[in-house]
Every structure is written in C-alpha cells, then in structure tokens.
C-alpha cells in the first residue's frame, strides 16, 4: 500500500494548490531551501500519524485544512478500508483528511458523495515512517553508522533496491 498522489491541498502552509505524485517504490524530495520539501513530509506525518494540525499549519485560521490523498494497494490488501474503494479502481481509495478549525482533530472520509467516514484507527495502521529533516546532515546522515540514522538508511537502501 502506498500514497500514489496528493490530489488536493487546501490551506496548508505553502502547499495550497499543489498536486504531488509519488512512485510506488521509492521517492526522493530534492530542491532548493524553503520550497516545501519538509512541509510535504510533515503533512504526511500529521495526516497518517498525529491526526491534528497545529495553528501554524493553517495559512488562514478561519478556513479548514483539506487534503485529498489517493492510496493504492495490492489485491491482498483489498478490504483494508472495508467496503470502501474508488469506483474506477478497486485497488485504490481516495481519502479526504479535513480539519475544520484549530481546536478540532482531523476527520477522514472516503471521497464519494456519501463521504463514508474512515476511522483514525484504520488510518494509523498504515505504515508511515517519518524521518525528520536534518540540520547537520554531514554528522547525522552517515551511512557508515550502524545505529540511529545510519542503521535506518542502510536498512531502507538494502530493502528497496
């Protein structure tokens, strides 16, 4: 199972209006400073692990944050979201994560006219690994290390190639 696309981003930091497509195997976010790479990672972490946006995440605190994700999965994973799947592809679901105000939590639903609710418990069981952006990469991202970040990076490389 993987996030194939972030279809819609509304009112979240500097990413409003952006569409982000992901590869099913491995993705790299590369670019200049302050263009939103970390914001993309934090968006995924907030939606799939934390479940609540902070006041600083809202571009305009009078408007809700709305994020629309397309998640694809294998035949073996059919049923993970119970009877919910996209009509045009039974191996995918388009999820909406929406937080109406700073004081609330994110609500999740299947993007259909019925807006079938998806529980946070279901969302949290998806495998999301969040690795925080480093400020001193030369010291912290060292593939020679056998503990900490080096261990994680080596594991990801060995099991992804």
Which residues does each PLM region occupy?
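Pre-Walker A-like glycine/lysine-rich segment at the N-terminus of P-loop NTPase domains
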Residues: 1-46
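Beta-strand secondary-structure signal
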Residues: 6, 66-70, 94-96
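Short acidic, glycine-rich loop/turn motifs
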Residues: 8-11, 71-75, 99-100
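Solvent-exposed residues in well-ordered beta-strands and their adjoining turns
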Residues: 23, 70-74, 134
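Core residues of folded domains in eukaryotic genome-function proteins
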Residues: 25, 65-67, 127
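Conserved P-loop NTP-binding catalytic core
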Residues: 41-90
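Glycine-rich phosphate-binding loops of NTPases
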Residues: 55, 75-161
């Amino acid at each position: 199972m993987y996030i194939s696309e972030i279809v819609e981003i509304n009112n979240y930091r500097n990413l409003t209006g952006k569409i982000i497509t992901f590869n099913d195997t491995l993705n790299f976010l590369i670019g200049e400073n302050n263009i939103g790479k970390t914001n993309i990672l934090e968006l995924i972490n907030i939606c799939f692990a934390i479940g609540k946006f902070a006041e600083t995440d809202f571009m305009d605190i009078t408007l809700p944050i709305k994020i629309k994700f397309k998640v694809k999965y294998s035949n073996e994973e059919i049923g993970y979201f119970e009877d919910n799947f996209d009509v045009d592809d039974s191996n995918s679901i388009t999820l909406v994560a929406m937080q109406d105000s700073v004081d609330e939590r994110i609500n999740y639903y299947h993007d259909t006219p019925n807006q079938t609710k998806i529980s946070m418990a279901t969302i949290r069981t998806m495998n999301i690994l969040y690795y925080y952006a480093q400020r001193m990469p030369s010291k912290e991202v060292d593939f020679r290390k056998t503990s900490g970040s080096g261990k994680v990076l080596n594991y990801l490389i060995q099991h992804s190639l």
